[in-house]
Amino acid sequence: MKRTYQPSKLVRKRRHGFRARMATAGGRKVIAARRLRGRKRLSA
């Protein structure tokens, strides 16, 4: 059985990147919450 995590920069950006987050209402909430919390990195 292969490992479940097969790193890919492109897939990571598309799924968890800033633009992917901003594309949905829930994603915008995630960014807002991370801003409030003072996260250095908002998204992948």
From Swiss-Prot:
Q: Which keywords does this Swiss-Prot/TrEMBL entry list?
A: Ribonucleoprotein, Ribosomal protein
Q: What GO annotations for molecular function exist for this entry? A: structural constituent of ribosome
The family line of this record is: Belongs to the bacterial ribosomal protein bL34 family.
Which species does this protein come from?
Bartonella bacilliformis (strain ATCC 35685 / KC583 / Herrer 020/F12,63)
InterPro entries the UniProt entry points to:
Ribosomal_bL34 (IPR000271), Ribosomal_bL34_CS (IPR020939)
User: What PANTHER family does UniProt report for this protein, alphabetically?
Assistant: LARGE RIBOSOMAL SUBUNIT PROTEIN BL34M, MITOCHONDRIAL RIBOSOMAL PROTEIN 34 FAMILY MEMBER
Q: Does the keyword Transferase apply?
A: no
Recorded GO cellular component terms are: ribonucleoprotein complex; ribosome
Superkingdom to which the source organism belongs: Bacteria
Q: Which GO terms describe its biological process?
A: translation
Q: What is the name listed in the Swiss-Prot or TrEMBL entry for this protein?
A: Large ribosomal subunit protein bL34
